[in-house]
Amino acid sequence: MMYPKNLPAGADTLIGMVGAISLTVMMILFFIAIVWFLQGTR
């Protein structure tokens, strides 16, 4: 994803933090979905 270059100072760090948090949440949800699916197929 590309962001405009005219962001105020500090916005780059904020975007990085939000991106890292959202990526972590997505990975956790993905892991839970896999475990739930594997338990449901037994």
UniProtKB/Swiss-Prot annotation:
Membrane topology recorded in Swiss-Prot or TrEMBL: Single-pass membrane protein
Localization annotation: Host membrane
GO CC annotations on file: host cell membrane; membrane
Main location (coarse class): host cell
Residues annotated as transmembrane: 18-38
Annotated keywords: Host membrane, Membrane, Transmembrane, Transmembrane helix
Domain of life: Viruses
Protein name: Uncharacterized protein ORF10
Organism in which the protein naturally occurs: His1 virus (isolate Australia/Victoria)
